[in-house]
Amino acid sequence: TEYADKWDCIIVDECHRAVTPGIKREIERFFGNSLWYGFTGTPRFAENPYPQMGDLPRTTQELYGDCLHKYTIQNAIHDNAVLGFQVEHNGPKNKKDETDSNLYVTESHMLKVLEVILNKSYYKLGFQNGKGKTYEGLLTTSSIQLAQKYYDLLKMVKEGKTTLKIDEKIKQVLPDFPKFAITYSVTENEEGSHVNQQKMQESLDDYNKMFGTKYEISQIQGYNGNLNKRLARKDAKYKSRNEQLDLVIVVDRLLTGFDAPCLSTIFIDRPPMGPHDLIQAFSRTNRIYDKNKVYGQIVTFQAPKLFKEGVDNAVRLYSAGSTQTALLADWKEVESAFRKSLKALRVSAETPEEVPGMSIKEKKIFVKLFQDFDKFFAQLKSFTQYEDNMLAGYGITEDEYTDYAGQYLNAKEKIKEDTDGQIDDPGVPVVDEDYELMAYSHTKIDYEYIINLIQNIVSPDEESQDVTQEQKQKQMDEVKQYVEELRKDNPKVAEIMTTLIGEIEQDVNKYKGQSILNIVENMKQECIEKVVTDFCITWYTSKDDVMYAAMHYRNGEIPNESAIKETANFTSYKEVQERAIPKFKYYTMMIAELRKTLDEEIKPLMNH
């Protein structure tokens, strides 16, 4: 009461929902003199007001006064604070009445939706990133009953009991896909609350089995909290594929205020929502995450015409009247741009084999054109209607793209090395040196990902400390599986990790609290030291010089070849060799052997 008669400043975050008009009026009556400041990304305008309730205010302006400052979606995208949206509108076309709900409740329709989610979202869900680094999706429906029906249908699909089969391309990356869950308020529908609770307990049982938890219906808040953390993946524990989800089915939960940067896509199988609800739902997908997540993905499955109108209106409303920045081009526009960029690329280099013979100026033009082509190719791949077999019709193959990509990377290196060409030429495009290929599929196992998994075994976070012995063994088996996959590309680093894992299995506390990354890097350095020492003993060369060569070896070039030859001791070499080679052959053979050692023994330990 001591504040009631004073001037009070009240600041409200998420003011579109945090304080209702009725509650605000009650607070104002208590605090006789108050100044209110509201922050919101989705204010209520005259176009989307609060429901009429007597004489209560219906817009954010009526509640808080004139807007003091605007920071729109366009501003945030321009500042690289969030991503733009790629929106696809699916569903029955050319229907007179798109609002006929009977079109969307059949199992046939639902299987078509699941076909898109399970088999047509390879790039939307980040399968090109590889196991453990894929993204997540939300599927939102208009009712709890439909959400439950989708959950049951997904279980049937996974058990092979429907006509819908998961593509081998998907299963090669994630054999256990999809890992899914469901969440809704068990009191949302009082009439069906008993059924909802029973169905939710069945879902909890599935969740418990999947992740080793023990949630009952009475612990629904604990379950929701755990689900939120699992989706957000901000704790080290959830970096492991064993602890991840691919899809969560919701009605309204998680559509506002939930922050999960690794969530890339929202699949909407419900009628068009209002502008405020659309933007809130869309905004779950456009958080900055990694270099391959370049926009938030939205896929709708009902009333395509009405949905497009609704989305365009909502984005205009919250982007100061424009959709240009926030919404990416549709399939037709992207496909046209892709064809044009491919044509331009072919003019620059009809085949990848032409690139090495180009001048630096020509290489710069090629690099810029390939960056444009790669950008449109990545956008094309992200649409659900994209099929790999379409490439033949465009006049290029995935293998040819990979060859172009290889030449592109080599050309970038040559441009960097060209010290004579640093002066800008007005006739040559500026090369974006920081550009990273977007359409390139690289499903190799990531070195740092395995390091993080091992780190969580030896130094678990708080949530991971109570796991059972069975779960610990499951974690270790997962790490071993990844190491074996790494062995295909880098057997030397894989062998070091295998040694480390063996030591951890013998004594899990041996490296507790220590940095696994530092330990592995030290083990790699020890291997490099041994290889260098053995080479120097054999050829009587300077260890410092050979070590320098090992640390700076690039593209087959030994940077200090002359110095190594100068300090090499042929006399000592000859004394210990029973059948020593002539001096004129010694230097040539020694450098050839060094290059082979660097390529086969050192380089794999320097690369991950």
Regions inferred by a protein language model and the residue ranges of each:
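Generic recognition of flexible, low-complexity loop/linker segments
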Residues: 1, 22-26, 72-73, 120-128, ...
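Generic, well-ordered alpha-helical scaffold segments in large soluble proteins
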Residues: 10, 14-18, 26, 30-34, ...
